[in-house]
Each structure stands twice: as C-alpha cells, then as structure tokens.
UniProtKB/Swiss-Prot annotation:
Domain of life (superkingdom): Bacteria
Lineage per the UniProt record: Bacteria, Pseudomonadati, Chlorobiota, Chlorobiia, Chlorobiales
Name of the gene: ispF
Protein name: 2-C-methyl-D-erythritol 2,4-cyclodiphosphate synthase
Biological source species: Chlorobium phaeovibrioides (strain DSM 265 / 1930) (Prosthecochloris vibrioformis (strain DSM 265))
The protein's required cofactors: a divalent metal cation
Pathway annotation: Isoprenoid biosynthesis; isopentenyl diphosphate biosynthesis via DXP pathway; isopentenyl diphosphate from 1-deoxy-D-xylulose 5-phosphate: step 4/6
Amino acid sequence: MRIGIGIDVHSFKEGRKLIVGGVDIPSPKGLDGHSDADVLLHAVSDALLGAAALGDIGLHFPDTSPEFKDIDSMILLKHVGKLLEKNGWRTVNVDAMLLLEAPKIAPFVVDMRKNIARCLQIETDLVSVKATTNEKLGYIGREEGAAAHAVCIIEKA
C-alpha cells in the first residue's frame, strides 16, 4: 500500500472556461493553462503518479507539447489510471480539497466525484471532493487563482 499527494495551482484568466473536476462551472473567468487547466484533476493525477513512483503530470503531459494544448484533463486522468493498472496498481481511495474564493462549487461536487471515479474505474464512494475558501487571504483570497490538494492510497492489484 502506498500514499500519494498532489498539489496544483492555476491563475484565473478572462475568456476561459472554468473546468474543475471535469465539470464546466459557470464563471466570468476560468483557469489559465496549457491544457483545460483543471486544477483538481491535475492534483489527483499527481497524487496517483507519485504514489506509484511514476513521476508527475509534467513528465507525462509536458506543457511544451502541442499534443496536450487545451486537452480535456479527464483524458489525462484516464491515462494515469491505465498507467497505474499497467504497473500493477489499483486505486483504493482519493481525497481532494479545492481552494478557491469563488464561485461556490458545492452544487457540482457530486458530478466531480463521479467524473474522477469514472476516469479511474472505481466506485464513487471511494472519491471525496471538498472545497474551502482562503478567507480572502493571498492570491486565492484575491480571486487571482485557485489551488487543489489531493491525497490517494493505492495498492498492488
């Protein structure tokens, strides 16, 4: 059994969609990045890759590659799940925390959990997604960006 942790941060940018946990959330601005900038799925991907000692998201999906420009991060997470399976691992659980001031994501959490579970081919009750604000402190509090932290447990299949 192994534990992994993943952290990701993206700044907000006008004119981009806000995609979090594979869900398109109504917002006047979205997260900026080479892919769809799904901060939650990136943190989950890094946690899983780290637990399996398979590097990180930047190694597998470099932001210098045109192949990954604007790619749906659910595709990336599915690839991570298959990579773990190929290396003899299975996901036991995922626990993730989203840090952003606005918009509120409570109405979208169930869909985020389902999306992560579907990508990893696990049951939804093995995935937890929570959110908190930064109490108006720092770049998150000023609504300049968002962050996500994720931990996971994997075990040999």
